[in-house]
A protein has these predicted regions:
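Conserved PLP-enzyme active-site core in the AAT-like
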Residues: 162-163, 193-367, 372, 376, ...
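General small-molecule cofactor/ligand-binding pocket signal
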Residues: 185, 238-240, 475
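Non-catalytic terminal extensions of PLP-dependent enzymes
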Residues: 1-183, 307, 357-381, 398-548
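Conserved phosphate/anionic-ligand binding catalytic regions in large, soluble enzymes, centered on
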Residues: 119-140, 187-198, 325-340, 344-345, ...
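A short, small-residue-rich loop immediately preceding and capping a beta-strand
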Residues: 182-188, 214-218
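Short glycine-centered, acidic/aromatic-flanked micro-motifs in structured strand/loop junctions
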Residues: 188, 242, 266-269, 447-449, ...
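Short, well-ordered loop/turn and helix-capping segments at boundaries between secondary-structure elements
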Residues: 204, 208, 232, 259, ...
């Protein structure tokens, strides 16, 4: 076989082997598109995109037909060479890879259809609790795409990358001011990465003092990444309880605090959207046993410009630039989780750190550099210096708004959440979806679907699925775990009153339907290409790749 010619025999055999699986999936799709019978005889419409055919849920592999091509390379101006001459048999596959064979129009249409099915912030309301899915200004994309930013190589000599280093240094200063702590590292590339950095810094700090502290305290409403981070750092998770008002239970904290504790990981506002009213006492208890206080910055959007974690007594703070500072997120990144620390933690920051040297002469410019001379550092956290494009967008956001603008962001986020919560309470929705905590919330709030499940016979999952038919991305469901049938709603500051009203109306309509016929919600969604997945089957028989 020559390298320039593709054999179709193996592909045809592969297609024949794949045909039964394809037919089974097509039949399953047809079965899935069937709708339940409802008591009132009416069925919600099964929507289909204009121009969409019945087989549009097929994967690109299932569209494959032997011999089809999207592109055919022209003949080369060199003689054909046998594959045997080019590669020894030990480096060759035993059969050609079973890659999809489709025409160019099929390829374009397939991915174009998929792109239109994406739901994102540019499509509609996205109140995913604890994720801060707010509008990301498009101007920042243009700034990040400038050649001086987008084409800069990470190995560029610092002397020829002064503009980029200056931006990073300026961002460090801005984040330090927002956190109320003097030193910042931009290296961590995600929130959980920032958490890991924080726990490693805490461990290094205690070890440098000759102390082996292996326990890390986390409240029972903490993000799931908190205990996972603790385990990754080689420490032990110790849970601290919360009281009926959603605050850290101070008696529980006192009983767990000891000289074995390295730190307490805490979000403020907490994961249930409430401000920790006892934060000063919490800091006193933690510092009283020689431990550090770590700030999970997942909910910083609610307080930035109003109060600062460092002023509350926190020693280490991580930021989610992809949440509070408008880096687009979802789908796996990129993100950024910089950390700010107090003076006693500074020696252990990851290396290198961006520094500014004063001008050597009057009228000269300051010089920016990367400082590797950090003997107590925990080392590098990644190959280069962080996700630079994220830094550009976040810096543009901070400079665009200024201090007063950032404060207005936080105030509006809290206002929107409390308006929406009040609207739910005063329009009968709270009867079946009450707030988990009867107090003023911050940027988000938790509802409990227990009364709805008990009285209307639909679960929080059913409600979330039915919201898809109303063109709304569902809030976070079944988290935090301490609230039964939880629904965590975060409207963010960039949504209008009309959008919040439409969301409340959608909830009211779903509850009205459930009173008359709960089967409607149980069968939802009806307007998506794929309905409910077989979660048990997916767990027992996962298909994680197409065979090649």
């Amino acid at each position: 076989m020559s390298a320039s010619k593709a054999s179709t025999a193996d592909r045809e055999r592969a297609q024949a082997q794949e045909q039964p699986a394809r037919q089974e999936r097509e039949q399953a799709t047809q079965r899935d598109s069937g709708q339940p019978e409802f008591k009132n005889g009416e069925k919600p419409a099964q929507a289909r995109w204009f121009g969409e055919a019945a087989d549009d849920v097929l994967t690109i592999f299932e569209r494959s037909r032997p011999g089809r091509r999207a592109f055919v390379a022209p003949p080369l101006g060199v003689p054909d060479r046998s594959l045997d001459d080019l590669l020894p048999s030990r480096l060759r596959r035993s059969a050609p890879p079973r890659l999809p064979e489709v025409s160019e129009p099929e390829l374009v249409r397939h991915y174009n259809r998929l792109s239109k099915r994406n739901f994102d912030l540019d499509t509609g309301f996205y109140p995913l609790g604890s994720c801060t899915m707010k509008h990301n200004p498009k101007l920042h994309e243009r700034v990040a795409a400038l050649d001086g930013h987008a084409r800069l190589h990470p190995l560029q000599d610092p002397r020829r990358a002064q503009g980029a280093l200056e931006l990073m240094w300026q961002l460090q200063q801005a984040l330090a001011e927002i956190a109320g702590l003097p030193y910042v590292s931009l290296q961590p590339s995600a929130g959980s990465h920032g958490e890991l950095a924080g726990v490693l810094l805490t461990r290094a700090y205690h070890e440098d003092r000759g102390q082996r502290r292996t326990k890390v305290l986390t409240p029972d409403n903490a993000h799931g990444t908190n205990p996972a981070t603790v385990i990754m750092a080689g420490c032990e998770v110790v849970k601290v309880g919360t009281d009926e008002q959603g605050n850290v239970d101070l008696d529980s904290l006192r009983s767990k605090a000891s000289d074995e504790v390295a730190c307490l990981m805490l979000a403020n506002p907490s994961t249930v959207g409430l401000f920790e009213s006892g934060i000063e006492e919490i800091a006193k208890i933690v510092h009283g046993v020689g431990a550090t206080l770590y700030y999970d910055g997942a909910n910083l959007n609610a307080i930035m410009g109003i109060c600062r974690p460092g002023d509350m007594g926190f020693d280490i703070v991580h930021f989610n630039l992809h949440k509070s500072f408008t880096q687009p997120h979802g789908g796996g990144g990129p993100g950024a989780g910089p950390i700010a620390v107090s003076e006693r933690i500074e020696p252990y920051l990851p290396r290198p750190v961006v520094i500014r040297r004063p001008p050597e002469a009057d009228g000269a410019e300051p010089e920016y550099d990367l400082d590797y001379d950090r003997p107590k550092s925990i080392g590098r956290l990644r190959g280069f210096h962080g996700n630079y494009g994220v830094f550009v967008r976040s810096y543009a956001y901070i400079r665009s708004l200024g201090a007063s603008g950032l404060r207005e962001v936080a105030e509006t986020a809290v206002l929107n959440a409390n308006y929406l919560l009040a609207r739910l309470r005063h329009h009968g929705i709270a009867e079946h979806l009450p707030a988990a905590y009867d107090r003023i919330c911050m940027h988000e709030f938790v509802l409990s679907g227990s009364p709805m499940k008990r009285e209307l016979k639909i679960k929080t999952l059913d409600l979330a699925k039915r919201l898809l038919d109303h063109g709304v991305h569902p809030p976070t469901v079944y988290f935090p775990l301490i609230v039964d049938e939880a629904l965590l709603v975060e409207p963010t500051e960039t949504e209008t009153k009309e959008t919040l009203d439409r969301f409340a109306d959608a909830l009211a309509e779903i509850l009205r339907e459930a009173r008359e016929d709960p089967e409607i919600a149980r069968g939802a969604p009806y307007t998506t290409p794929v309905r409910r997945l077989d979660e048990a089957g997916a767990a027992r028989r996962p298909v994680v790749r197409q065979p090649c």
